[in-house]
Amino acid sequence: METAAESPPGYHHGNLREALVAAGLAHLDAGRSPDFSLRELTRQVGVSANAAYRHFASKEDLLIAMALEGFRRLTLEQASAIQAQASLAAGFMAAGRAYVAFAQRHPALFRLMFGRFVASNGSEELR
């Protein structure tokens, strides 16, 4: 029986789903397009190429998870910007500035979130 110390590298990854989403987001934040392969991301994370399919049926499912994480982050940034304001009007303006700032900091993710892929995707989560 193999112990954890004897297991091959990448044999078990406790948070593989989150690690793959994070690797995909880092890929986009590095200025790259979403044209990566799941194999490329699994290599970065240190697991076998087939391990990703335990969490994502396809690359499209991973892209959906990445877009959802982008929307979650954008929502948190806008909410934080709104809460820091004294009036509704100032909060509305702050939310708009947070939206633009997010798009400027994460242009590839923003394109994924608001581009054709999400618009044409039938995912219930993205509606």
Residue ranges and their predicted role:
Residues 15, 19-26, 44, 61-83, ...:
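Alpha-helical structural segments
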Residues 106-111:
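Short, structured loop/turn "capping" segments at alpha-beta junctions
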